[in-house]
Amino acid sequence: MMRQYELVERVQRYKPDVNEALLNKAYVYAMQKHRSQKRASGDPYFSHPLEVAAILTDMHLDEATIAIALLHDTIEDTTATRQEIDQLFGPEIGKLVEGLTKLKKLDLVSKKAVQAENLRKLLLAISEDVRVLLVKLADRLHNMRTLGVMREDKRLRIAEETMDIYAPLAGRMGMQDMREELEELAFRYINPDAWRAVTDRLAELLEKNRGLLQKIETDLSEIFEKNGIKASVKSRQKKPWSVFRKMESKGLSFEQLSDIFGFRVMVDTVQDCYRALGLIHTTWSMVPGRFKDYISTPKQNDYRSIHTTIIGPSRQRIELQIRTREMDEIAEFGVAAHSIYKDRGSANNPHKISTETNAYAWLRQTIEQLSEGDNPEEFLEHTKLELFQDQVFCFTPKGRLIALPRGATPIDFAYAVHTDIGDSCVGAKVNGRIMPLMTELKNGDEVDIIRSKAQVPPAAWESLVATGKARAAIRRATRSAVRKQYSGLGMRILERAFERAGKPFSKDILKPGLPRLARKDVEDVLAAVGRGELPSTDVVKAVYPDYQDTRVTTQNNPAKAGEKGWFNIQNAAGMIFKVPEGGEGAAAKVDPAATTPKPGKRALPIRGTNPDLPVRFAPEGAVPGDRIVGILQPGAGITIYPIQSPALTAYDDQPERWIDVRWDIDDQMSERFPARISVSAINSPGSLAEIAQIAAANDANIHNLSMVRTAPDFTEMIIDVEVWDLKHLNRIISQLKESASVSSAKRVNG
């Protein structure tokens, strides 16, 4: 275990003016607090925070961050308090130690929800101070290094979470060395057989090619030296996880991989990077399509380097990375390499780390999504997806660079520029040409968004976008628009209900009734009434507890809408709302347009349904030509019944659930609808065949036939047929009745 003076010396190597008192005090305090604790391995618990601190010294972090690492488990696992740490080390260190503690104190139902909420809390904490991320990643790295002592199920859970969240997060924040080590450790426990096989093959390959690698390294160094470029060249081998992932994703065998070895060239200046590139390309043949310039266009995590692939001395492909030494440090340590020292000689002023980086820009965008939705697991999936995605770089007409994941569309671009631009997007010009909004953007595209103040993002856009930010914003806008529609409908229903009750009505009048209705605000009440979840009479009674409902309930028939017992209200947009007399809730919105179909699928041919609610037919079915009614099923959408269905009697006393609907059939209609016929046939040879022939002659499809009762001289059966409409069905029934083999035939409802 590292001694106190050894820790101080490690920091002094890169920061000679280190605050030794702070480090010594944190070391002694943490050691005393953890002195009676052991890890699962049997080692003293203090060895863990000490190793976390050591990892951070390898990243050349300041003494304040090292102190936070030493203290990070004290509040959670010992008698230490926030107040005590504030007094000894200052409130800022105390705040960060407490913040790291809170990340662990979660009590949710599903593992996925725990992981999602952990990620949310971590990202929010990072947004306040990036040192939370640095300590958290170092903490996870040491836990992964010592994971072997855990139970197998726990090892697997921690390894999967590391692979899904912590490794890609380290990469997204530019910390490539840490990302690679986390991936390798996780791979070892997630798929030990594959890890062992790939590791063994890589060791064999390295031994076989050691001489060749040394030759290429020497050749490169000599070329640079002859041309006056001060450069260091270092060979590197792909890590086992990187190799395995490529084999899996591209379906390759180990022997088919051609770029397992690579070289890193480090020079002093950007100019030398391009000079070195020119020398390499004039000495060896380059592989077309494998050149990437991340110096002129850095990655979103601030990674900068030139990548190229050449054909080496033995005709094998060799990948080279050319960068300055400063770029190399940023590539290894990411945001930690952006530290700006502001030492004022006090522990109360810990050193800050710059947030003016591309990695932080990604982080800020991700944080914005936290306010766009309330489903943590959904947020987790979107964020995990974006952590792994490759990028394309596009430009606004004014030259602003916008980084997007591969597969992004102009809609993603619009939301990346600003949420308001995304919400008002109606079209896009890509490189000066108007293109569909589903167009996949490519590197270098210039995108000009066409906007309209009247635009509301349609829900269908969600399937066209690749970024979590766009997806969350579309959901928010869709929810807001739907809620606004329902609120407007609820307002009109309540106005009528209060009028019938002889009571005054306004939004403010509803406020005293909120506790009785268990609703958070007035808009929530209005939307619930509009959706049919909350009867209007319940609202009247909540506001006026002495109100008595004296209505006489009768069977309400939506087919008689416009007659006594019903009234219509129409808004400025032409939407008609049919409401039962007495104000007992809404039937539903009657939209002049049919329900919007999903892509590639025609909607049900029904007018009068809310486009935001699912619609289905009742089991007994209805066919065009039937008089139909919709019944609002709270939480399950709308069910369509034929008006003669006996099942409707169950809703006689719930008029607020009845919806006036009608068919929306055109000449191009090619759909068939299920109907049921009860047939009593004479029990003689060939009678069943004759029934089938009648159906076939009328172009009807029998998809089910069941015998109900069989007697010596007749058979009763139920036939399910698919027909075009009511006329088609009646023609079949009429011909069945005329058949000598059939004694009776009639339609069955229910």
UniProtKB/Swiss-Prot annotation:
Principal EC category: transferase
Entry's Gene Ontology cellular component terms: plasma membrane
Region (Disordered): 587-613
InterPro entries: ACT-like_dom_sf, ACT_dom, Beta-grasp_dom_sf, HD/PDEase_dom, HD_domain, NT_sf, RelA/Spo_fam, RelA/SpoT_AH_RIS
Keywords: ATP-binding, GTP-binding, Kinase, Nucleotide-binding, Transferase
Entries under Gene3D superfamilies matching the protein: 3.10.20.30, 3.30.70.260, Beta Polymerase, domain 2 (3.30.460.10), Hypothetical protein af1432 (1.10.3210.10)
E.C. number(s) listed in UniProt: 2.7.6.5
Observed phenotype of the null mutant: Cells show morphological abnormalities such as branching and swelling forms during vegetative growth. It is unable to persist during stationary phase, presumably because of nutrient limitation occurring during this growth phase. It shows an important growth defect in human HeLa cells and in ovine macrophages MOCL3. At four weeks post infection the number of viable bacteria (deletion mutant) in mouse spleen is markedly reduced compared to the wild-type. The deletion mutant shows very low levels or absence of VirB at all time points of growth.
Any one of the GO BP annotations: response to starvation
Keyword Nucleotide-binding in annotation: yes
Reaction(s) the record says it catalyses: GTP + ATP = guanosine 3'-diphosphate 5'-triphosphate + AMP
Limits of the HD domain: 45-144
Similarity comment: family membership: Belongs to the RelA/SpoT family.
Purpose: Functions as a (p)ppGpp synthase. In eubacteria ppGpp (guanosine 3'-diphosphate 5'-diphosphate) is a mediator of the stringent response that coordinates a variety of cellular activities in response to changes in nutritional abundance. It is necessary for persistence in mice, essential for intracellular growth of Brucella and required for expression of the type IV secretion system VirB and therefore plays a role in adaptation of Brucella to its intracellular host environment.
Protein name: GTP pyrophosphokinase rsh
